[in-house]
């Protein structure tokens, strides 16, 4: 910095105000009518967003529930859910674990973090397993592991392909 720039900087008055972040206007709309994109902040009509498979124009992909993914993938009405495996819910006896599972079941409407079943795509049969991150962050416990293994055994015994969508937060 030369001498002239130093003098100019010395006599410049500092800003006496602090810029405030603009608040976004609140939209008075019925619950669930609009969905805001966390990436571009655009407000979508939820129905239109769902018709676009939950993908915003900016490219952001909203999380999908297991049943939504199944409905997008397989032929309409072809999905037959497999019965869940019989495994101990809390084999390591973690405290409050059963209560957490109960809350997740009530909140999500699914039994565990994976949904498995038989379906068709363009009339071709297959076995599909879809993990749902809403349930214990899609983590893999004994039930999830056994459900996937059982689905693969079923597919193998019938010579069917397996499609597996993972959305796991790890093991539990």
Question: Where is each model-derived feature located?
Answer:
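Terminal-region recognition feature
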Residues: 2-172
